[in-house]
Curated annotation (Swiss-Prot):
Protein name, as recorded: Protein mab-21-like 3
InterPro entries the record matches: Mab-21-like_nuc_Trfase (IPR046903), Mab-21_HhH/H2TH-like (IPR046906), MAB21L/cGLR (IPR024810)
PANTHER family: CELL FATE DETERMINING PROTEIN MAB21-RELATED, PROTEIN MAB-21-LIKE 3
Gene (UniProt): MAB21L3
UniProt family annotation: Belongs to the mab-21 family.
SMART domains for the chain: Mab-21
Length: 362
């Protein structure tokens, strides 16, 4: 069994982390060709959905949550000039068109309503009853339309042998066969809101020392997305802002990214393996951001072993408490809908690791 030494770090990074990067890059390359083909067909069927572009470098529409689990955001077209809702009002509708005696619950944390009137410009199709109820663009109805378009696209593009729609899920999931293994994709329609920062994201906090104020303004300029992944409420997402923050971690020469990469490798190989793990790369990324904020100085990230174990202790604390705040929207818990038993299993593995830190299985 190996202990955390400089030599082990080099071995882990070169032989494990780099190998993972190559495998993931190959999978992303194959997946994005399929996604571009599918979404181009979908866009031709319905102007409200935009094709996911093909990219030779980083594709901001594809987020790797685990080696075999990707999140793919499909841009929504025909909604421009977003503004925050001016006033709140009760909703009494159902997805079936009946009226409720009591109002629907208000959105919490990362959720919000979305009214078509919140946009200065909108295609007339967004006012149609297939996606709109009482002026609200309803994510469940958008997903229903989108799922049918995906089904048609799989048939039309002759991808039935390579792509299969996964049923019995409220979201739209497809399985894609790559040359190495099967990857499950969650295809999520997304309203992209560039240059505007959500009022729900009260960030940064007062007296926060990381990142710098200049970097904060840069990150906020990337805006946010609204994802259609529930019945009535849209979910806030900051994928672009998070990616920029992740890319610019170590300008001072620290080892933050190395710590993250090794932690992700151990999570995927030992602590929480599997196709749809309870802990994803996004959770690890959030733990990293919180730790960087608490330890903002270069001196805190000079020695890998100390910095890495500090990061793992933070992860263990969050998993044990079943509580991980979103980095930008702090009144939300990213573990709220996760399986507590699975979290406890991961917490036990992390506790064992921290008692005797090792970078590989027996």
């Amino acid at each position: 069994m190996k202990y955390l030494t400089v030599g082990d770090l080099e071995d882990c990074l070169l032989n494990k982390v780099d190998l993972r990067r190559q495998q993931i890059s190959q999978a992303v390359e194959e997946v994005q060709k399929v996604v571009h083909h599918l979404t181009t067909n979908i866009s031709n069927q319905d102007i409200r959905f935009q094709a996911v572009p093909y990219s030779d470098t980083y594709n901001e529409n594809i987020k790797v949550l685990a080696p075999s689990q990707f999140l793919v955001t499909v841009p929504i077209k025909g909604l421009a000039g977003y503004r925050e809702a001016r006033e709140q009002h009760w909703r009494y509708y159902t997805l079936q068109g009946t009226r409720l005696p009591c109002p629907l619950r208000d959105p919490e944390g990362l959720q919000q309503w979305l009214e078509v009137e919140q946009f200065m410009k909108s295609l007339w199709q967004w006012h149609e009853t297939d996606v709109n109820i009482d002026g609200d663009i309803v994510p469940a109805k958008v997903l229903l339309v989108f799922r049918k378009l995906v089904e048609n696209a799989v048939r039309t593009c002759h991808l039935s042998g390579k792509v299969s729609l996964l049923g019995n899920r409220s979201a739209v999931w497809v399985a894609v066969e790559t040359s190495a293994y099967q990857v499950e994709l969650e295809l999520v329609p997304a309203v992209e809101i560039p240059t505007t920062w959500s009022k729900k994201a009260r960030w940064p906090r007062c007296l926060q020392r990381w990142p710098s104020q200049e970097r904060v303004e840069c990150i906020k300029s990337f805006g946010f997305n609204l994802l259609a992944c529930s019945n009535y409420h849209w979910q806030l997402s900051f994928l672009r802002a998070e990616q920029v923050l992740l890319e610019q971690l170590d300008e001072d020469g620290g080892c933050r990214r190395k710590c993250f990469q090794v932690m992700r490798h151990l999570k995927e190989d030992i602590w929480c393996p599997g196709n749809r793990p309870v802990i994803t790369s996004h959770h690890l990324q959030t733990v990293l951001f919180w730790t960087c904020e608490k330890y903002p100085h270069f001196k805190d990230w000079q020695v890998f072993s100390k910095a890495f174990l500090r990061l793992v202790r933070k992860l263990h604390k969050c998993v044990s408490q079943h509580f991980l705040k979103h980095y930008f929207v702090r009144n939300s818990n990213l573990f709220q809908c996760t399986n507590p038993t699975e979290l406890d299993t991961v917490a036990q593995k992390l506790a064992t690791f921290l008692k005797n830190p090792q970078i590989g299985p027996p």
